[in-house]
Amino acid sequence: MNMNATILGQAIAFILFVWFCMKYVWPPLMAAIEKRQKEIADGLASAERAKKDLDLAQANATDQLKKAKAEAQVIIEQANKRRSQILDEAKAEAEQERTKIVAQAQAEIDAERKRAREELRKQVAILAVAGAEKIIERSVDEAANSDIVDKLVAEL
């Protein structure tokens, strides 16, 4: 019985120990475990949200990059059109300037040609009068000479 009383004492001590652990030790341990489980669950949920946010950000970045490339392409096309337009305008302006310069040069050539013809006519008339004076061997007065030159110029 001695052994039974020892076993009974040990059983009572064990039951008291279990009750004490259940009452004072077990609740803080369970609270710590539950707190840790909650933190882990929150961390996993946060990681999942972060992954979704990252995927969304990458999709937005890809969309913005596509939009930027499209806008850049439009700007490049507009710049090329404007460049072509400026070149066409410059060519047209250069053509007009060339036409103007050619017309001015032609007018100057025509004026110079007329002046040279008039000068040549006067010289021919003077030479003709000089030749006629030598043939006649007499001097014609200045008024008559001028009259003859004018008539000769008009005939030429």
From Swiss-Prot:
CDD domains: ATP-synt_Fo_b (cd06503). This is ATP synthase subunit b. One of its GO terms (molecular function) is proton-transporting ATPase activity, rotational mechanism. Signal peptide: none annotated. Keywords: ATP synthesis, Cell inner membrane, Cell membrane, CF(0), Hydrogen ion transport, Ion transport, Membrane, Transmembrane, Transmembrane helix, Transport. The chain crosses the membrane at residues 11-31. F(1)F(0) ATP synthase produces ATP from ADP in the presence of a proton or sodium gradient. F-type ATPases consist of two structural domains, F(1) containing the extramembraneous catalytic core and F(0) containing the membrane proton channel, linked together by a central stalk and a peripheral stalk. During catalysis, ATP synthesis in the catalytic domain of F(1) is coupled via a rotary mechanism of the central stalk subunits to proton translocation. Component of the F(0) channel, it forms part of the peripheral stalk, linking F(1) to F(0). Belongs to the ATPase B chain family. HAMAP family: ATP_synth_b_bprime.
